[in-house]
Amino acid sequence: MLWIGANTDYNTNFPLPEVLRMDKAPLEYQYFKGKVPKDSDVHGFYNLKDKTIYIRGEYPIEHPWSQGLILHELLHYVQDMNNVKFKCVAEMEKDVWPLQKKYLKEVHNFDWNYDQLWYMTISSCGEY
C-alpha cells in the first residue's frame, strides 16, 4: 500500500484485503462462476463483493511475478475503495498495467514487456 500511495493519487488508508492463492482450475472456476472458457488464462482477480484478492499460486509468494499479481489486484481494490468510476470493466486496467510494470522494475528489477496492442485492447472500452 505504501508503494501505491507513493506512486498514485489514490487514498490508501484502508485495511489490507485478504489474499487467497489457488491453483489455476479452481481460480478460473471462481472467476467465471463455473463457466470457464476453453482458452482461459486468468492469473488473478479482485472480487468486488467480498473484497478479496485471488491469485494463482504456482509461483512462491515472494517471487516477483506473484508480488506483481498481488499489486495488480491490490490496485483494483484501491480503485474500488476510492469509488473510481469507469465506463467499462476494461477501463479499470488502463492505469494498472503500467503501474504493475513500473513496480516490477523498481522494486524487483523484473522486466515485464507486455504487448502494447494487447494492452490497448484489454484496457479500452469499445463496441465488441
Give the ranges of each region predicted by the language model.
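Short pre-active-site segment immediately N-terminal to the catalytic Zn-binding motif
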Residues: 53-70
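Active-site recognition of the HExxH zinc-binding catalytic motif
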Residues: 68-81
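Flexible, surface-exposed loop/gating regions in the mature catalytic domains
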Residues: 83-87
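Auxiliary, metal-adjacent structural segments of Zn-dependent hydrolase domains
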Residues: 1-53, 60, 116
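Mature extracytoplasmic domains of secretory-pathway proteins
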Residues: 42-43, 61-63, 75-78
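Post-HExxH zinc-binding segment in Zn-dependent metallohydrolases
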Residues: 89-124
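Acidic/histidine-rich, surface-exposed loop or edge segments in extracytoplasmic proteins
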Residues: 50-55, 78-80
